[in-house]
């Protein structure tokens, strides 16, 4: 996860304007899995409360790292990816619950959000960084092992079954948003007003300590967005790009083709999605980048009743 998200492809700024009376708040900041986080509570905590709160924040990130982090070789998801068994694999309650959500995201996105592209994506990145393209035979082999249909969730026994031994999961497209949702649940134990951000995915509740709405700037729109009790996630391709054979490729793969988005065919630069659920917004922002035009993406979002902001190469 660390390497995958490191170039903060989705840089979103929050403007926390200080009132003259220095409104009551407590701030937690740090870096986890190479990604900066910021948590703002609209209450002043005592020293002991702040110490305990920091401990619980660390535990949430440890939880994400130990279960969902593809870059941690000892995580649960990494162990599943290494397994080539076709027998049912027992899942932790946390991973099973999240995979059920992933199943919902995949269906809702009409297959445009596909968490089985990890191995294929790594193959492409390995070659693009070397200014080459993968051999067609190798691409065909990897593509055969992608697709959500190659996984089966048993909702009675809480197990996962691979229908192909080589299929792998990469949950990076939604797990940052999921972590932000978990941090939001934690914050709600202390106060109604809070702001959580991890690497560009944001969740807000109530108001800023000064009494105004939370003011958010997104790379997907020139507008300043004012959020209350909602989340925003942004996906974009303008920060990881490679020039190979007179074409510009990005780090996002089109699940329908298995090929990285190529600038001349995919003009969308950034997408922000607003929703109560940050994991859902995260997944849908990724899905919306795979459309071949801004209008096509907007039409799909309207049909799905999504609140979105999109910018393309025309900066429109």
Swiss-Prot record:
<feature type="binding site">
    <location>
        <position position="33"/>
    </location>
    <ligand>
        <name>FAD</name>
    </ligand>
</feature>
<feature type="binding site">
    <location>
        <position position="282"/>
    </location>
    <ligand>
        <name>Mg(2+)</name>
    </ligand>
</feature>
<keyword id="KW-0732">Signal</keyword>
<protein>
    <recommendedName>
        <fullName>FAD:protein FMN transferase</fullName>
        <ecNumber>2.7.1.180</ecNumber>
    </recommendedName>
</protein>
<dbReference type="InterPro" id="IPR024932">
    <property type="entry name" value="ApbE"/>
</dbReference>
<feature type="binding site">
    <location>
        <begin position="112"/>
        <end position="114"/>
    </location>
    <ligand>
        <name>FAD</name>
    </ligand>
</feature>
<feature type="binding site">
    <location>
        <position position="253"/>
    </location>
    <ligand>
        <name>FAD</name>
    </ligand>
</feature>
<dbReference type="Pfam" id="PF02424">
    <property type="entry name" value="ApbE"/>
</dbReference>
<dbReference type="GO" id="GO:0016740">
    <property type="term" value="F:transferase activity"/>
</dbReference>
<feature type="binding site">
    <location>
        <position position="176"/>
    </location>
    <ligand>
        <name>FAD</name>
    </ligand>
</feature>
<keyword id="KW-0472">Membrane</keyword>
<keyword id="KW-0449">Lipoprotein</keyword>
<keyword id="KW-1003">Cell membrane</keyword>
<feature type="binding site">
    <location>
        <position position="286"/>
    </location>
    <ligand>
        <name>Mg(2+)</name>
    </ligand>
</feature>
<feature type="binding site">
    <location>
        <position position="71"/>
    </location>
    <ligand>
        <name>FAD</name>
    </ligand>
</feature>
<keyword id="KW-0460">Magnesium</keyword>
<feature type="binding site">
    <location>
        <position position="173"/>
    </location>
    <ligand>
        <name>Mg(2+)</name>
    </ligand>
</feature>
<feature type="lipid moiety-binding region" description="N-palmitoyl cysteine">
    <location>
        <position position="20"/>
    </location>
</feature>
<keyword id="KW-0274">FAD</keyword>
<feature type="lipid moiety-binding region" description="S-diacylglycerol cysteine">
    <location>
        <position position="20"/>
    </location>
</feature>
<keyword id="KW-0285">Flavoprotein</keyword>
<keyword id="KW-0564">Palmitate</keyword>
<feature type="binding site">
    <location>
        <position position="170"/>
    </location>
    <ligand>
        <name>FAD</name>
    </ligand>
</feature>
<dbReference type="GO" id="GO:0005886">
    <property type="term" value="C:plasma membrane"/>
</dbReference>
<dbReference type="GO" id="GO:0046872">
    <property type="term" value="F:metal ion binding"/>
</dbReference>
<feature type="signal peptide">
    <location>
        <begin position="1"/>
        <end position="19"/>
    </location>
</feature>
<comment type="function">
    <text>Flavin transferase that catalyzes the transfer of the FMN moiety of FAD and its covalent binding to the hydroxyl group of a threonine residue in a target flavoprotein such as NqrB and NqrC, two subunits of the NQR complex.</text>
</comment>
<dbReference type="InterPro" id="IPR003374">
    <property type="entry name" value="ApbE-like_sf"/>
</dbReference>
<comment type="similarity">
    <text>Belongs to the ApbE family.</text>
</comment>
<keyword id="KW-0479">Metal-binding</keyword>
<keyword id="KW-0808">Transferase</keyword>
<keyword id="KW-0997">Cell inner membrane</keyword>
């Amino acid at each position: 996860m660390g390497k995958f998200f490191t170039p903060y492809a989705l840089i979103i700024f929050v403007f926390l304007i200080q009132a003259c009376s220095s409104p009551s708040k407590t701030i937690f900041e740090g870096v986890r899995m190479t990604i900066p986080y910021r948590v703002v509570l609209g209450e002043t905590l005592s020293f002991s409360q702040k110490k305990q709160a920091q401990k619980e924040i660390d535990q949430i990130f440890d939880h994400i790292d130990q279960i969902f982090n593809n870059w941690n070789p000892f995580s649960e998801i990494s162990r599943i990816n290494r397994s080539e068994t076709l027998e049912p694999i027992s899942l932790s309650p946390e991973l099973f619950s999240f995979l059920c959500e992933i199943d919902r995201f995949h269906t809702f996105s009409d297959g445009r959000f596909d968490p089985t592209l990890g191995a294929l994506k790594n193959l492409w990145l390995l070659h693009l960084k070397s200014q080459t393209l993968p051999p067609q035979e190798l691409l065909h082999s990897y593509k055969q092992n992608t697709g959500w249909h190659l996984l089966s969730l048993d909702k009675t026994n809480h197990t996962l079954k691979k229908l192909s031994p080589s299929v792998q999961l990469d949950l990076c497209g939604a797990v940052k948003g999921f972590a932000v949702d978990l941090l939001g649940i934690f914050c709600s134990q202390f106060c109604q007003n809070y702001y959580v951000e991890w690497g560009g995915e944001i969740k807000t509740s109530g108001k800023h300590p000064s009494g105004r709405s939370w003011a958010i700037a997104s790379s997907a729109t020139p507008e300043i967005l004012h959020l209350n009790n909602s989340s925003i996630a942004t996906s974009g391709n303008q920060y990881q790009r490679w020039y190979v054979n007179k074409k510009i490729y990005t780090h996002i793969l089109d699940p329908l083709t298995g090929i990285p988005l190529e600038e001349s065919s995919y003009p969308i630069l950034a997408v922000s999605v607003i929703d109560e659920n940050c994991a859902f917004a995260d997944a849908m922002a990724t899905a919306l980048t795979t459309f071949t035009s801004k209008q096509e993406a907007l039409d799909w979002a309207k049909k799905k009743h999504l609140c979105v902001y999109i910018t393309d190469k025309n900066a429109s």
